[in-house]
Regions:
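Mixed-charge (Asp/Glu-Lys/Arg
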Residues: 1-46, 51-149
């Protein structure tokens, strides 16, 4: 079942930000429902969006990426919209273990989550099709297994 979106007609650029914030809150909530204490990081332009406590004294830096399409991006630093100066060089970068420990991809259409360790994305390009990420879909055991590493 697809979720209802923007029935009030918020301007598309503004709604994009609202939707991104919603995906972050959904991701944090899903971690908590899975049994992992999790908190959103409210620092503008931080490289990660949340911290999750996976047990054994381990905290992970989590980048939450929402998607309503068929793929997920593993990059940060890029923004779009009228407010962006296109004359400035791109600041887009691919996340690494220096930035984050985990990508938590949230399907914006239904809330499905993909739990992807950053080590795994290092082997891939900047994007990957959700259909090729089935092993990560709703696989919360990945967080449990990271606690024992």
């Amino acid at each position: 079942m697809a979720w209802t979106k923007n029935i009030t007609g918020i301007e598309s650029g503004v709604f994009r930000s609202v939707n991104g914030n919603s995906d972050e809150m959904i991701g944090v909530g899903r971690c908590m429902k899975a049994g992992f204490p999790c908190s959103r990081v409210d620092v503008t332009n931080a490289k990660y969006d949340a911290i999750v406590d996976i047990g054994n004294g381990k905290l992970l830096r989590v980048q939450i990426k929402g998607t309503s399409g068929a793929s997920i991006s593993f990059t940060g630093g890029g923004r779009s919209g009228q407010q962006i100066n296109r004359a400035v060089a791109s600041r887009t970068y691919k996340y690494t273990k220096d930035d984050i420990d985990l990508i938590l991809a949230v399907d914006s259409t239904n809330g499905d989550c993909y739990i992807i360790p950053v080590e795994d994305i290092s082997k891939w390009g900047n994007t990957k099709s959700l259909s090729k990420l089935k092993a990560y879909k709703e696989n919360w055991d990945i967080l449990k297994n990271l606690a024992t590493k």
